[in-house]
Each structure stands twice: as structure tokens, then as C-alpha cells.
Amino acid sequence: MLIEDAVSSGTPQFVIDSYATLAERAKTQSFGLIEEDVIVLDTETTGLSVQDNELIEISAARLSGREVVDRFDTFVHPKQLISAEITELTSITNADVADAPSAVEAVAALADFVGGCPVIAHNATFDRSFIESVKGGVNVSDIWIDSLALSRIALPRLASHKLSFMADLFGCDSVSHRANADVDALCGVCLLYTSD
């Protein structure tokens, strides 16, 4: 996909040129907050409602500067069965989660992994609400950064701010509706937001 096709009509040429070189510049730029360790996180759930659905996968990466220095990946054993629709979307089956830790155990392990670092998630309100609905989930992090909101500020002329769209456009890892692949894509996209 060409940058010209991915921006809103009427976008000035200098903005298009800036977006076109963004991925290359992100490899060499100096960053602010991103130079500190941050946790890039994604979850998969049995549905969209925090009241009616549950976590089934949590993935996170510790990003230090431009490098992923540690990973956290776990399935989560839900109390309800995973529907065929969710299995089709995520490829996560009931067999995958059968011996997985409970949500309380998984979120406690996540809190240990995060260790007080800021957490970045695409549409962070969704992931945070599921994490914090679990006992002990409020202890995961005090700082949650929504990369969706950040992309709308940093790249306002993009036609879409979906993670899959941006990952494809800027040559980051692909998005697959699996938490670990989405974390890989988001790590790449996060570096784009903060380049000069």
C-alpha cells in the first residue's frame, strides 16, 4: 500500500513525505519516554463485554529503547467455553486453555512481569478493563497509554488508525488476532509514533 493511498484527501505533500519516511526514521531517532522500559500488551478474550466475557490470552513485551528485551505470553483458562466464532477469529481453542492458569494467576504473573512500568496497548481501555476486572488486576500498572489515541495525535492524516492497517502500511509485523503477534506489530508501530 502506498502512503498516498493511506492518508485523508487533501493531505499536504510535506505530510505525505514525512509519513513515507517514518518507518526508516524510526530506526535511528532518539526517543523520550520510549527510552525507558515500557510494556507493550495485548489480550484476547471470549468476547467484547467485560461483564459477560473473559480473558483467554495475555501477551506482553518489555520494550527497552528499540529492543524487545523480555516476553510474557500465557493462555488463560476461562470459566466459560470459547465459542466457535472466537476460535475462528483467534485460533485459540478450548484445548489450548484447558491447562492454562486461571485469570487470577495469569494476571498476578503479568503484574510481576510489568513491575510498575507503563503499559501501552492499542485501545487500552479494552485491555485494561479486562485486566482490572480480575482480582489483583488494578495492581498491574498505574500508567496505561492508549496507542490508538496516540496514533490519532501523532499521525492525524491516516485514513485508519487500526493496528492492522498501520502495521501493514509501515512494514511492521502482521496482526493476526493473536495477542503475541499483535504485540509484535504494536512494538513496531510504537516506535513510529515517537520519531521526529
Residue ranges and their predicted role:
Residues 1-6, 193-196:
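Conserved small/polar residues in nucleotide/adenosyl-binding loops
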Residues 4-5, 10-143, 156-177:
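Conserved non-catalytic scaffold segment of RNase H-like nuclease domains
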Residues 43-47, 186, 193-194:
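Ser/Thr-glycine-rich phosphate-binding loops at phosphate-binding pockets of nucleotides
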Residues 115, 191-192:
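Non-catalytic alpha-helical coupling and interface elements of nucleotide-dependent molecular machines
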Residues 129, 148, 184:
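Active-site phosphate/pyrophosphate-handling residues
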Residues 142-151:
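A short, structured active-site edge motif that brings together acidic residues
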Residues 181-189:
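Acidic, divalent-metal-coordinating active-site segment for phosphoryl/phosphodiester hydrolysis
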